[in-house]
């Protein structure tokens, strides 16, 4: 007699299947970044290649539920529990070593960033360095409701580090220092170096008290107004510190949350695994660059009849702002340590080419993980911020719709052993 199987809904199973190692509702362990977490299987795609499971991480918000390939899921048994504890212990030891290095590590990271961008001297080399690199900051966990605003131009109170000036680049504004990236359970870590390490993915940095210069995201319906003064009129000062916000202004600042679609989250994990664990690199120049993706999205919006002339202008301004952010942030905030040697080589070979014309979709996706924290320092009023986030979310939907084109794992290439030795 043939076995009667339950009907499939939307090509995934809600029961058991002979081709799967895990069943729905099973308690499992699952890799997320460098660590292993307790999880539960909610749904299964037995027909996928490889088989995929829809995972809920125990104790995490359901926003982190995601489809993962079978090779990231482990049976919940004593051996794997010990493996999980050992990885957590190793990660904790690394954190302690990093804390002991203190300012010496920060200076080393700053030197590495300067060397990686030193192929062309900056026109603003005489400008003063930002106090953000030397002033302690107060961090706050990422993630709260986004708020927004009216009209004006983007202004920030800053004496930020000057960045390398390059021909055809739209911005020479400085990149901010960031908090140590990590997995969702690592939100309480102290701020550290801006560079993304091998063991940690590029996620949103924590909020700081320092206002810093950033590219603007403006348009007919996306604009900004100046930040309030850092000192009150009733308390005059002879030498005001424009780069330091008042306690009231800092407390009133609202973090901006950009929701990454579930369909794109697993590409971030696959990206991390390919670079950090498998020691692969994304081929450069990318087959489809950030600039080309931006142009394709604009062409797509123009083809829609409901896109008015004014909306088209606003979309174009938002895309220009995203590209500016990408060019400014890539070198210091969007790279894994293993990619830095490749980055330095690219900077030597293409000193006058914008990074948005060299790097592609995977690095662009990393940008959106951090972009919310960057926008928290803008002076956008409620309506303007809402308009901006609407455009950003629509752009992410465009990436989802074309994910099979933009996020192919065939874009990753193997490197020779010499590169691996030098990168480590």
From Swiss-Prot:
Gene3D superfamilies: 2.30.30.140, MRG domain
PROSITE patterns documented for this protein: MRG
GO process terms (BP): chromosome organization; chromosome separation; DNA repair; DNA repair-dependent chromatin remodeling; heterochromatin formation; positive regulation of gene expression; regulation of DNA-templated transcription
Keyword annotations: Chromatin regulator, DNA damage, DNA repair, Nucleus, Phosphoprotein, Transcription, Transcription regulation
Modified residues (Phosphoserine): 119, 211
Residue numbers carrying Phosphothreonine: 175, 183, 196-197, 235
Compositionally biased region (Basic and acidic residues): 107-116
Listed Low complexity bias regions: 122-165, 232-242
Subcellular location: Nucleus
Compositionally biased spans, kind Basic residues: 97-106
Alphabetized CDD domains for the sequence: CBD_MSL3_like (cd18983)
Molecular function, one GO term: chromatin binding
Protein's job: Part of the Tip60 chromatin-remodeling complex which is involved in DNA repair. Upon induction of DNA double-strand breaks, this complex acetylates phosphorylated H2AV in nucleosomes and exchanges it with unmodified H2AV.
Name of the protein described by the UniProt record: NuA4 complex subunit EAF3 homolog
Gene: MRG15
């Amino acid at each position: 007699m043939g076995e009667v199987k339950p009907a499939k809904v939307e090509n995934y199973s809600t029961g058991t299947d002979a081709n799967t190692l895990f069943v729905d509702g099973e308690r499992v362990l699952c890799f997320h970044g460098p660590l292993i977490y307790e999880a539960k299987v909610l749904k299964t795609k037995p027909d996928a290649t490889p088989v995929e499971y829809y995972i809920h991480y125990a104790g995490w918000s359901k926003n982190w539920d995601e489809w993962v390939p079978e090779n990231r899921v482990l049976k919940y048994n004593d051996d794997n529990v010990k493996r999980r504890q050992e990885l957590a212990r190793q990660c904790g030891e690394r954190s302690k070593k990093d804390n002991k290095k203190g300012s010496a590590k920060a200076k080393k990271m700053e030197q590495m960033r300067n060397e990686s961008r030193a192929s062309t001297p900056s026109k603003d080399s005489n400008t003063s360095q930002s106090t953000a690199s030397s002033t302690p900051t107060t961090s706050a966990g990422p993630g709260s409701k986004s708020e927004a605003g009216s009209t004006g131009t983007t202004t920030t109170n800053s004496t930020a580090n000057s960045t390398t000036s390059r021909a055809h680049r739209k911005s020479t504004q400085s990149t901010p220092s960031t908090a140590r990236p990590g997995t969702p359970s690592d939100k309480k870590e102290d701020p550290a170096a801006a560079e993304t390490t091998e063991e940690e993915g590029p996620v949103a940095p924590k909020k700081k008290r320092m206002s810093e210069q950033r590219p603007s995201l403006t348009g007919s319906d996306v604009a900004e107004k100046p930040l309030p003064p850092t000192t009150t009129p009733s308390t005059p000062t002879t030498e005001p510190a424009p780069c330091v916000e008042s306690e009231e202004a800092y407390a009133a600042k609202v973090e901006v949350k950009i929701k990454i679609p579930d369909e794109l989250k697993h590409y971030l994990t696959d990206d991390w695994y390919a670079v950090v664990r498998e020691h692969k690199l994304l081929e450069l120049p990318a087959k489809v660059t950030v600039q080309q993706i931006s142009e394709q999205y604009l062409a797509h919006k123009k083809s829609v009849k409901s896109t008015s002339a004014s909306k088209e202008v606003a979309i174009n301004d938002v895309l220009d702002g995203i590209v500016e952010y990408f060019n400014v942030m890539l070198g210091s905030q969007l790279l894994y340590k293993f990619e830095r040697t490749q980055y330095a080589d690219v900077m030597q070979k293409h000193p006058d080419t914008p990074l948005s014309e060299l790097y592609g979709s995977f690095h662009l996706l990393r940008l959106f993980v951090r972009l919310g924290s960057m926008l928290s320092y803008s002076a956008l009023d409620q309506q303007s911020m809402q308009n901006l986030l609407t455009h950003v979310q629509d752009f992410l939907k465009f990436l989802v719709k074309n994910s099979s084109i933009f996020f192919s794992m065939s874009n990753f290439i193997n490197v020779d052993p010499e590169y691996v030795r030098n990168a480590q």
